């Protein structure tokens, strides 16, 4: 059974481990280009998690951390927010955990935080992630063409 809760400092190591030996492009794929530098360190994860408006959540299968993601960029006036920096352990992928995690993050955003809309960005090549987001109800709202077309991406949105 999947459970989620806000991450604690001791769990940041798992996020770093999920990136070990994966390369810079993998880090960019799940975290974007601005939040972290390769190679990822616990200090970087800690600094990101402590930023105003960021809540880092961990997903667990029993007591084992298997995934992480943020609710961030909350606009209280517009009641909007973003889901950012989603990552899962390699052995937790393609088992339905991503869908469960997103559903729970969405529930927290809508029911506990009072948001009415969530958005996220995803690279066009990340077809598995796009399918997962669509299963939860996210829909593509915008396409962003980058100078390097490999990094073209979509904005997706889920409304309450």
Each predicted region: which residue ranges?
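C-terminal "cap" of GNAT-fold acetyltransferases
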Residues: 81, 116-119, 123-130, 135-160
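Acetyl-CoA-dependent GNAT
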Residues: 6-12, 17-93, 102, 108, ...
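Extreme N-terminal starter segment of soluble prokaryotic enzymes
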Residues: 1-3
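Conserved glycine-rich acetyl-CoA-binding loop
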Residues: 85, 89-103, 107, 117, ...
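Aromatic side chains
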Residues: 12, 57-60, 97, 110, ...
